[in-house]
A protein has these predicted regions:
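Secondary-structure edge/capping motif, primarily at the C-terminal ends of alpha-helices
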Residues: 217, 232, 260-267
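Conserved NB-ARC/NACHT P-loop NTPase core of NLR-like innate immune receptors
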Residues: 1-207, 212, 221-226, 232-243, ...
Length: 315
């Protein structure tokens, strides 16, 4: 048995170099015309920047292998980007510095040329990706935030190297490593305000999206179940759920209160939330319980109501 942190650094560096060589060889083999690529100097620089972090190496390869771009140009672009916006003495190098520099470089490459007025939408989409209770698809993010599905997917595609992302807009997307949410929600690490995510603001946005969606769509007997029949006795219950309750509404019903919990780190009056929350509790409460019942998560109602009660007491 071995302990990962006890492995010699030279062995880790060697493994990362092998990973880079194998990945570049696969890319060159698939595309052709990439003889003697990358150069030894480029490979050495990538290994130096990786600083023993496989997550850095993986994100680098994902960035270079962008499905619509020239990998050679992607590598050149990445190596030309500054490693950081602040001075870094090697003796004072923090463990996350190299990875943070890569993440920031990828974000700047993807969105740096955007108009400033587009930044709030980009931040909203990034916030949904990193703060979602469960991974969300482009279509669900679009529904909750009131955006176009195509627009959301294009924004996510721009940072595909940081995500697990499929071509299907209905397939959930998520960060490919936990270090990305940690980075983008920490202002001492993500020092570009265009990309930093302040969790309470984006929990608020997702919460309002969930509540509005439930207020719009919830109705009595969503799954058209026969009266007087227990859920367990309905043979095609899940087929009815799939037909009548889409993923966006399921997420809203099961997760809204968890976004409300996310606001407790920065309590402040938020009239928009109070208004839609009151409407939900007064008009859609019983229909919501019905949905939780068919989803098999009715027990969550107790926790959700407790959280809502505490919020309304404060606000």
């Amino acid at each position: 048995m071995f302990v990962l942190h006890e492995i010699e650094q030279s062995q880790v560096d060697s493994d990362i170099q092998l990973f880079f060589k194998h990945s570049f060889s696969e890319t060159a083999g698939c595309l052709g015309g990439l003889d003697n690529w990358p150069t030894r100097e480029q490979l050495d620089l990538l290994c130096e920047r990786a600083a023993g972090l496989f997550v850095y190496a993986m994100a680098t390869i994902k960035f270079i292998n962008h499905r619509t771009k020239d990998p050679k140009e992607q590598l050149d672009c990445l190596l030309q980007l500054p490693e950081s916006t602040v001075y870094e003495g090697k003796a004072k190098l923090k463990p996350n510095t190299t990875l943070d520099s890569l993440y920031l470089s990828i974000l700047q490459e993807a969105f740096g040329d955007n108009y400033p007025e587009d930044d709030p939408q980009t931040q909203s989409i990034l916030g949904a990706i990193v703060l979602a209770v469960n991974p969300l698809s482009s279509s669900t993010i679009a529904t909750l935030l009131g955006l176009s599905v195509k627009g959301v997917f294009l924004q996510l595609s721009a940072i595909h190297s940081l995500l697990i992302l499929q071509e299907d807009v209905n397939h959930p997307a998520q960060p490919f490593h936990k270090s990305f949410p940690d980075f983008i929600t920490d202002p001492t690490r993500c020092m570009n305000p265009r990309f930093h995510i302040f969790p309470p603001d984006h929990h608020s946005e997702l919460l309002i999206g969930c509540l509005k969606l439930m207020n719009q769509r919830l109705e009595r007997n969503m799954c058209r179940l026969p009266d007087g029949v227990a859920n367990s006795e309905v043979d095609n219950l899940w087929e009815r759920v799939e037909q009548h309750i889409d993923h966006s509404l399921r997420y809203a019903c099961q997760s809204w209160h968890k976004h409300l919990i996310g606001l407790h780190t920065a309590p402040a009056p938020r009239p928009r939330i109070t208004s839609v929350l009151h409407q939900f509790l007064e008009e859609k409460f019983l229909f919501w319980l019905e949905v939780l019942s068919v989803l098999g998560t009715a027990r969550d109602a107790v926790d959700a109501l407790g959280v809502a009660g505490k919020w309304l007491e404060v606000c």
